[in-house]
Amino acid sequence: MLIYSDIITGDEIISDSYDLKEVDGIAYEVDCAMIEEGAVQVDIGANASAEEADEALDDGVVKVNNVVHSFRLQSTQFDKKGYLVYLKGYMKSVKNALKEQGKSDEEIKDFETKASAFAKNVILAKFKDWEFYTGESMNPDGMVVLLNYREDGTTPYVVVWKHGLKETKV
């Protein structure tokens, strides 16, 4: 299995156990699902019929997004201006990380061009529809994972920056 971690913070962001679809050579989209968390049934062997009226307890069932829950992503908020400031700094950090990895100037220029187009045409075009998540460490310099819903309005998906991930085999 491959775990993809943020190259800046080291936070685990996604794994190949989810179906990663590359988009425009710059990002990965991953379809998610809402799952129920909690509600553990414990049978202690008591005779339920001999007990008094069944106590109605809140069993703590919570619907959570499987990717957000599995990788302990933390919700955060941005306005458009704040996100642009963050994105500029983040892209500079990724560019520096790519240089450290020995990527060519051509590859880095390609990254910058594609990232700019993706941010403008995909993220900013529908900015109000996105939800934002940081990695577990909540480091403000790290990747912000984007969550949105497909056209059906019920299927969530996340978007992560391809070049901001480090692959680790486990």
Swiss-Prot record:
UniProt entry tagged with the keyword Cytoplasm: yes
Name of the protein this chain belongs to: Translationally-controlled tumor protein homolog
Main location: cytoplasm
SUPFAM superfamilies registered for this protein in UniProt: Mss4-like (SSF51316)
Annotated keywords: Cytoplasm, Cytoskeleton, Microtubule, Protein biosynthesis
A cellular component term, taken from the record's GO annotations: cytoplasm
GO annotation, biological process: translation
GO molecular function, one term: calcium ion binding
